[in-house]
Design a protein with these regions (language model features):
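Short, conserved loop/helix-junction motifs that constitute active-site signature segments
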Residues: 52-54, 138-139, 172-174, 200
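Acidic, His/Gly-rich catalytic cores of divalent-metal-dependent hydrolytic chemistry
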Residues: 158-240
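Active-site environment of divalent metal-dependent phosphoester hydrolases
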Residues: 10-15, 39-41, 65-68, 119-121, ...
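Core catalytic region of metal-dependent phosphoesterases/phosphodiesterases
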Residues: 2-96
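His/acidic metal-ligating clusters that form di-metal
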Residues: 27, 90-158, 240
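Hydrophobic/aromatic beta-strand patches that form the interior of the parallel beta-sheet core
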Residues: 32, 57-59, 114, 146, ...
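Active-site-proximal beta-strand elements of phosphoester/diester hydrolases
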Residues: 2-10, 110-117, 179-183
Length: 240
């Protein structure tokens, strides 16, 4: 059994379609979404529908929450605010309700999923180093937890200490916990513009991060055509 685990789509339909196609080619039979389906790019409705059509477990991200609420969005940067105000106008009330009702944390089979952190999932903190990871490990009751939010693929391990694993592929070891950032489908920020997602092979007990080229020019063109800030289109090619 293989799980395709993905998140931070951010309304980038071209990237999402590429990830879902690749997951099928890799033999994935199950899908899990770590949130932030919407925000930044120009296809929030289509991306939301694609995730809903999968019928898979989903957790709420901060951009999902922003799009579904009537809050001022003052905690977000101006680019994110601009995109979310536009996104609110695109989504139906039914779609916004669906986003509002998503849980912050879920257990799927033998692993946990969250968008940001386990210690305070609704405060949208970032796990970028082993000290951040320590706090989430304290609330992790499964061997593996998958998360997103930073848009940077990373694997943290915990046995008698917490450390960042080398690379983004791992063979699970007995007695070790793993806190795994699967990267971003639609807006990577690690200097690599390619879409990212993870495959968890239950039988082989492996987790691997895949990177995929997609039709970035079309995604950029849609952002500009929608009247969204051009910087949101430009940054896709920079991977930041």
């Amino acid at each position: 059994m293989k799980f395709a685990i993905f998140g931070d789509i951010h309304a980038n339909l071209e990237a999402l379609q590429t990830v879902l196609w690749d997951a099928q080619e890799q033999g994935c039979s199950n899908y899990v979404c770590l949130g932030d389906i919407v925000g930044y790019a120009a296809n929030p409705v289509e991306c939301l529908q694609a995730v809903q059509d999968l019928g898979c477990p989903v957790v709420r991200g901060n951009h999902d929450e922003g799009a579904a609420s009537e809050s001022s969005l003052e905690e977000l940067n101006p680019l994110a605010q601009n995109a979310l105000l536009w996104t609110r106008e695109q989504l139906s009330e039914e779609q916004r309700l669906w986003l509002r009702e998503l849980k912050l944390v879920r257990q799927v089979r033998d692993f946990t999923i969250v968008h940001a952190t386990l210690d305070s999932p609704g405060n949208w903190g970032y796990v970028t180093n082993r000290f951040d990871a320590m706090a989430s490990f304290s609330y992790q009751f499964t061997q593996v937890c998958f998360y997103g939010h930073t848009h940077v693929p990373r694997i943290f391990e915990k046995d008698d200490a917490v450390r960042a694993a080398r690379g983004t592929d791992v063979l699970l070891q007995r007695g070790v916990k793993y806190f795994v950032n699967v990267g971003s489908v639609g807006q990577p920020r690690d200097g690599d513009w390619r879409a990212a997602y993870a495959i968890y092979d239950v039988q082989a007990q492996t987790i691997s991060i895949r990177r995929l080229e997609y039709d970035i020019e079309t995604a950029q063109g849609k952002i500009r055509a929608a009247g969204l800030p051009s910087l949101l289109a430009d940054r896709l090619a920079l991977g930041k």
